[in-house]
Amino acid sequence: WPAIKQQLQAQLGAKLDDLTIDHEPLGTASLAQVHRATRKSDGLELVLKIQYPGVADAIDSDMSLFRNMLKLTRMVPQTREFDQWFDEVREMMHREVNYQIEAETTRRFAARLKDDPRYIVPQIVDEYCSDQVLCMTFERGVPINSPVMLSLPQERRNQLGEASLEIAVREVFEWGEMQTDPNFGNYLVRLGNGEDIHDKIVLLDFGAIRQFDQHLLTVARNLIKAGYYHDPQMMVNAMTGYEFFDSIPESIKPDMAKVFLLATEAFSHLDNNRDLPAGVMDEQSRYDWKKSQLH
């Protein structure tokens, strides 16, 4: 806590006196620490994401050191693809410590979902934000993997699952940017009462949201469409034009298409996919992940 307090004082100055901050973190990670806080003037509950001192400045040197280690040990072939991947990781690391970008992304998603009662996005509180501190409203909820979630009726769990998948599909087909770190820690569920108050998904962390170029988005959309229609040739065609797939021998592509069709089985329409295993669809023609072979 002393190091975190010193960082807060350096970043927020006198504004820090406005807040009562819990010394125990809500969560810790390699780049930052999250603390709960309360604004004294009105009792507003907040969350402060506090970047560790020196993290942003160390990214390039640490990444270069890691890259040299890989070269010396020859653990990874030194190819153009590796260079592209490494530069991509470096760029993503810099984005994750750029709290201005994360604040803007959070606002963008909040605006998109503000009229949808199934989702909650924290509100950014600019007054207590800086280059290395991100402040937002505290949003209550239970973890995705909480035993409470397992005790929910199946229909409520289905609705939460559908809402989660809908976000992913809209990211690809509508918004053109995706959450590239969809781990359970980035989500909570605010439970309703099963009647007039519905369950809501709380979206917490937008630091790993990545925008994709139109070409890659077109490839991804066509792959998903091919899965929906469960069409092997359509799947092969969807692969064409993307460097990774174009480098694969033509003789292998049909087999790879079969793998992709299996991976997108849950998105295929029953009328298009006669290969669906028996019992994998429920009485309402919905895909039952628990009975599938995909998990």
Where are these regions (language model features)?
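Conserved ATP-binding subdomain of kinase catalytic cores across diverse folds
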Residues: 1-145
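Histidine-centered active-site/metal-ligand motif
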Residues: 35, 179, 183
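The start of beta-strands in P-loop NTPase/AAA+ ATPase cores
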Residues: 44, 132, 176-178, 200
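Short amphipathic alpha-helical signal-transduction/dimerization elements
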Residues: 67-74, 168-173, 228
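Intrinsically disordered or highly flexible coil/loop and linker segments, enriched in small
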Residues: 75-79, 98-99, 115-119, 173-177, ...
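Conserved kinase catalytic-core helix
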Residues: 109-116, 151-180, 193
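Helix-rich C-lobe and terminal helical cap/extension of kinase-like folds
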Residues: 130, 139-143, 147-163, 190-295
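Hydrophobic residue at the +6 position relative to the catalytic HRD Asp in the kinase catalytic loop
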Residues: 185-189
